[in-house]
Amino acid sequence: MSLQSIKYTRGSLEILDQLLLPVQSKYLPVRGVEDGWKVINKMQVRGAPAIAIVGCLSLAVEIHPEEFDSKKSLRQELEGKLNYLVSARPTAVNMKMAADELLSLANDLTKDDNVDVAAMKQRFLNATEAMLKKDIADNRAIGAHGAKAILQLVAAAAGAPMAGPVRVLTHCNTGSLATAGYGTALGVVRQLSELGKLEHIYCTETRPYNQGARLTAYELVHEKFPATLVLDSMVAALLRAKNVAAVVVGADRVAANGDTANKIGTYQIAVVAKHHGVPFFVAAPLTSIDLHIPSGDHIIIEERPDREMTHVGEHRIAAPGINCWNPAFDVTPASLITGIITERGVFQPAQLKETITKLLET
């Protein structure tokens, strides 16, 4: 059974505090937008899909007991709070996409004379809750498309009609803890396992916040997958020695040309995968694809505090006085990406803008 990182019923939201894992499993109440902003900014919840879900649900929890005297005042409240939530971690596009979608709904309802303020609030709550259900369904579709693509590539390379069990590498955390459930890149791994086609999954530690060691390893042990943790600096040796069939990572933002922002360290894994001829896949929902930016050069990269590099918990591990550069993400060029796995299929980066534009029109 997958881990549950988000517990929601109308008017109530709790999130699993990921800063305490794997030592302690503790759920935190999120009573409104201020709590939502804090748990996102402090990375007590992380992963682009989960950030969007928790952000939107924190707003739903806040407005649930409130009464508004007009649709205009409700719309203004929603706009201000959604914009505030987007600022918590700006690199991940999913929160911005969700905010735009909900604000568009609010604008339409404000103009609709057949909808009163109570009905408008109800429609807004329904829309946020629908996002939670859709994320899980989308993740399962991503898993199915990704597993199929990997197995087809492996079979074709071997000149065989069917691929045997495969070894896969992933980076950071993209499972149930990073989404509403099931996972994106880890959802692909989960689907391979369900098909009996997963021989082994390798996960990186993912310095400096150790999401791989703390979170992905925690999920893999929970699921009883055959899994091994490796240091970030071991990836080249791993791909050379262990017959890894594919690399699958998540994404915080994908540009129109396929350039992909993901957890720091992703870029160097893609370079090494290219050198060793290992397919490199990005698994992400359509909400992570930002067609408004032409390339990765336009993606804002969040920089995190020095302390995340210099300390582990309360213990300093770096020399006092040393300067630090701590970008949370890097951008992998589209030329290094074999395919982008979405809930609607697997696309080559060069096809992305045209294909996604057509899908969104249907």
Curated annotation (Swiss-Prot):
A Gene Ontology biological process term: L-methionine salvage from methylthioadenosine
Pfam families per record: IF-2B
Catalytically driven reaction(s): 5-(methylsulfanyl)-alpha-D-ribose 1-phosphate = 5-(methylsulfanyl)-D-ribulose 1-phosphate
Record's GO cellular component terms: cytoplasm; nucleus
Active site: D252
Pathway: Amino-acid biosynthesis; L-methionine biosynthesis via salvage pathway; L-methionine from S-methyl-5-thio-alpha-D-ribose 1-phosphate: step 1/6
Gene Ontology molecular function, alphabetical: S-methyl-5-thioribose-1-phosphate isomerase activity
Record carries keyword Membrane: no
Gene3D superfamilies: translation initiation factor eif-2b, domain 1, Translation initiation factor eif-2b, domain 2
Similarity comment: Belongs to the eIF-2B alpha/beta/delta subunits family. MtnA subfamily.
Protein name as catalogued: Methylthioribose-1-phosphate isomerase
Organism: Drosophila persimilis (Fruit fly)
